[in-house]
Amino acid sequence: MEQPPAPKSKLKKLSEDSLTKQPEEVFDVLEKLGEGSYGSVFKAIHKESGQVVAIKQVPVESDVQEIIKEISIMQQCDSPYVVKYYGSYFKNTDLWIVMEYCGAGSVSDIIRLRNKTLTEDEIATILKSTLKGLEYLHFMRKIHRDIKAGNILLNTEGHAKLADFGVAGQLTDTMAKRNTVIGTPFWMAPEVIQEIGYNCVADIWSLGITSIEMAEGKPPYADIHPMRAIFMIPTNPPPTFRKPELWSDDFTDFVKKCLVKSPEQRATATQLLQHPFIKNAKPVSILRELITEGMEIKAKRHEEQQRELEDEEENSDEDELDSHTMVKTSSEGVGTMRATSTMSEGAQTMIEHNSTMLESDLGTMVINSEDEEEEDGTMKRNATSPQVQRPSFMDYFDKQDFKNKSHENCDQSMREPCPMSNNVFPDNWRVPQDGDFDFLKNLSLEELQMRLKALDPMMEREIEELHQRYSAKRQPILDAMDAKKRRQQNF
């Protein structure tokens, strides 16, 4: 793969002259890197300096207040452990946010590409930089609120930087704690889920979960429905490693200090930087081998995809010349072949192969944002806003509607019959209203086993029914709000 030219001078901030030009005059966009919060992220070169940057292109119809908040927080940050912000452009219907480029990608990308979890030494080195980033943010009275391996980026030298401030928040003197449920379900601190108010140490809980994620490939509860996890995190004891005997006492103790359920007793970033597991961390040079390996795999896959696209185009041209083409006589068969090819490619990655729940449900949850205002880069809670009766974490599942609908439209022959059918469970299997379970004594062992086996699917069905009822109540309110906003704009 062709290497970008060496930078002529280090880019610190885009000049006023650069910001008045069209972005295409200032940058050469090279390739798409992936999806961030609210938009797609591209790799580009700043023409004047030759420096590689990342550009997040955000559709204007996205939540503009959240985007402005992300830019505001990034603008205020100046730390080698936080992704730098260079400037923004409006281009047609997109906002272009120009940021520091981290060539190795996220920690979760590297785990996926290599199909390997990280060693203790690698984890300690990454956590040391991450804690320095959190110490800086928390000193600035900012909460990241979405710490996970996917939001810790590595540059090619191995330096870890915090990224994706789409859901970050600002603490002020007049607001000691926040009450909004924001983040990604499996990484959330108990106090965030319970909406009892939280502060900077909520990020420390998420860091503890991230430590387990880096060691085991996925966070605790990743194999179960996120709604169930949301109920389990505040009530269950703090999670631990699946096989504690594989990990050192120092690492186990570090995770234990992060995952203290009481926020008052949880360690701070500054305290954790003095923990033996972090103090004994090795230099970033130990990460170069895994970074090189991950980048080589990524480049190889990119070349394979390009070849496949070229082959498909050639085959398509040949098919058009053939009067009895496969596409014409058996288009469904071709579709099935492509689906199988995609599945086999996905199976090469550990997380996609082992946990479909993880792939589909780890999106970032943003709740109650209507109750927050942006004012001079500072987030403030509106104390006069009416109490919301709806459990706020239900909003996260509204975001999954599109994915769920697309799954429903999948070819039925490619999957087992759905166990969520309304006809699967008799009504008399539901929990008795009076709470009297004495009737269970009269059932046979086989009937009891069937009931036990059916509990999880029944729960899934009831959760889905509850979600649908809330969605039906919520949509008219959203429609009315949209109508009012449109009238105000027209006025």
Curated annotation (Swiss-Prot):
The modification Phosphoserine is found at residues 15, 316, 385, 444. The active site is at residue 146. Keywords: Acetylation, Apoptosis, ATP-binding, Coiled coil, Cytoplasm, Kinase, Magnesium, Metal-binding, Nucleotide-binding, Nucleus, Phosphoprotein, Serine/threonine-protein kinase, Transferase, Ubl conjugation. Inhibited by the C-terminal non-catalytic region. Activated by caspase-cleavage. Full activation also requires homodimerization and autophosphorylation of Thr-180, which are inhibited by the proto-oncogene product RAF1. Activated by RASSF1 which acts by preventing its dephosphorylation. When autophosphorylated at Thr-180, recruits STRIPAK complex and promotes PP2A-mediated dephosphorylation and inactivation of STK3. Residues 27-278 form the Protein kinase domain. Homodimer; mediated via the coiled-coil region. Interacts with NORE1, which inhibits autoactivation. Interacts with and stabilizes SAV1. Interacts with RAF1, which prevents dimerization and phosphorylation. Interacts with RASSF1. Interacts (via SARAH domain) with isoform 1 of NEK2. Interacts with ESR1 only in the presence of SAV1. Interacts with PKB/AKT1. Forms a tripartite complex with MOBKL1B and STK38. Interacts with RASSF2 (via SARAH domain). Interacts with DLG5 (via PDZ domain 3). Interacts with LATS1; this interaction is inhibited in the presence of DLG5. This is Serine/threonine-protein kinase 3. It comes from Rattus norvegicus. The lineage of its organism: Eukaryota, Metazoa, Chordata, Craniata, Vertebrata.
